[in-house]
């Protein structure tokens, strides 16, 4: 089977992007640790996010779905029984290709009193895990991974809060430590090497955890019970970036993106488009689950070459490919 794709001369219209993947992971995990049933509308249908649901189900969490993925009315219900309530699985848990699932669940499972093995596909088994192992072992868990790569064996334990200075700018490392901090005694703090996505901190607050943020230092008080919530996942800004960039580049284009996440740690690509000369309008329409959302409108203009600095790269990690296409 083959398809011919023709470059349009212009694009125009209104789109609603699929649910954000990063936020979907975090809402599902925290719902599994809350005491009660949470409803998560517009949960991402991406394979990685489905890996998170499969992982939680293997740990005894009850999850059900209503409607069809990526269609209006789609939602999942996740029933949790509080911190420390996950059950030992029957065997190793395969997280597929999802590094987010493995690293964040390592933090969650470090505070549970059983052994679990997290594995994945060939690609995931080549990714580094030592950056997550180090802080979790400082908190009291025991983790083993040959040469720092999966499979990852986690032996949960009673955890203590730590002050962790992260050597890398990584939202996943920060998230793993904060999720472990939920189960620790005292306060756990993470000092960021550079600003990263803050979806975990926002979600923790939405579920009722005690979270603080001062000058690049994020803290969480252990033992705070989480309450269930009903929430909608905003549209994925990284998916929106492709059509936004196309609208900026193709003459006479005008695209509106509704219901999209407008978290400031995810909208740097809009600043790049503006600097290049595109007409970009952003309207924040509300906040749900700690996440701002709204509308983006992009209209084409004559674009100019620009430079992207090294400091900007961490906040553009998903959008760099399409911005590179724009530069071409």
Residue ranges and their predicted role:
Residues 1-328:
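Structural preference for solvent-exposed beta-strand-turn elements
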């Amino acid at each position: 089977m083959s398809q011919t794709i023709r470059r349009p001369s212009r694009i125009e219209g209104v789109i609603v992007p699929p649910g954000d993947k990063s936020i979907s992971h975090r809402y599902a995990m925290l719902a599994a640790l809350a005491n009660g049933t949470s409803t998560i509308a517009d949960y991402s249908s991406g394979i990685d996010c489905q890996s998170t649901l499969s992982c939680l189900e293997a740990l005894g969490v009850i999850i059900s779905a209503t409607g069809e993925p990526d269609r209006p009315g789609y939602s999942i219900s996740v029933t949790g029984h509080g911190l420390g309530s996950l059950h030992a699985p029957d065997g190793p848990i395969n997280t597929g290709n999802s590094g987010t699932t493995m690293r964040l669940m390592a933090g969650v499972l470090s505070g549970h009193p059983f052994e679990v093995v997290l594995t994945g596909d060939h690609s995931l088994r080549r990714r580094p895990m030592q950056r997550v192992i180090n802080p979790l072992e400082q908190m009291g868990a025991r983790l083993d991974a040959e040469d720092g790569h999966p499979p990852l064996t986690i032996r949960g334990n009673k955890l203590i809060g730590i002050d962790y200075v992260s050597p890398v700018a990584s939202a996943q490392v920060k998230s793993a430590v904060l999720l472990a901090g939920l189960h620790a005694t005292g306060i756990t703090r993470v000092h960021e090497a550079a600003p990263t996505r803050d979806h975990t901190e926002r979600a923790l607050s939405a579920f009722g955890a005690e979270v603080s943020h001062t000058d690049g230092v994020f803290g969480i008080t252990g033992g705070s019970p989480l309450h269930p919530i009903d929430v909608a996942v905003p549209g994925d800004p990284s998916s929106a970036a492709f059509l936004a960039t196309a609208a900026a580049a193709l003459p006479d284009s005008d695209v509106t993106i509704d219901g999209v996440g407008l978290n400031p740690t995810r909208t740097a690509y809009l600043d790049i488009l503006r600097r290049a000369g595109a007409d970009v309008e952003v309207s924040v329409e509300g906040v749900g689950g700690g996440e701002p959302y709204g509308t983006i409108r992009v209209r084409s203009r004559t674009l100019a070459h620009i430079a992207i600095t090294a400091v900007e790269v961490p906040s553009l990690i998903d959008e760099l490919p399409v911005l590179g296409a724009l530069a071409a």
